[in-house]
Amino acid sequence: MSSLPVMVLFGLSFPPVFFVLLVSLTLFFVVNCLLQPTGIYDFVWHPALFNSALFCCLFYLLFRYGL
């Protein structure tokens, strides 16, 4: 049995990981907007791969330690 309950919103049931996903997506966009002006993407070999890895790391950190 999972320790996290299923969330019901307007008659639709969502798994708990869905809300962690939404929070991590929001945090990803904030971090991405902060990294854009720094010019870090000039040093990144593959920006899409970097963004995917950044999102995966944020999702893991929020799921494991945050929410």
Curated annotation (Swiss-Prot):
Signal peptide start-end: none
Chief site of localization: membrane
Keyword Chloroplast assigned: no
GO cellular component, one term: plasma membrane
Record's keyword terms, sorted: Cell membrane, Membrane, Transmembrane, Transmembrane helix
HAMAP family on file: AaeX
Record field: transmembrane: 10-30, 43-63
UniProt protein name: Protein AaeX
NCBIfam families hit by this protein: PRK11594.1 (NF008615)
Localization of this protein: Cell membrane
Keyword Hydrolase in annotation: no
Name of a matching Pfam family: DUF1656
Membrane topology summary: Multi-pass membrane protein
Homology family: Belongs to the AaeX family.
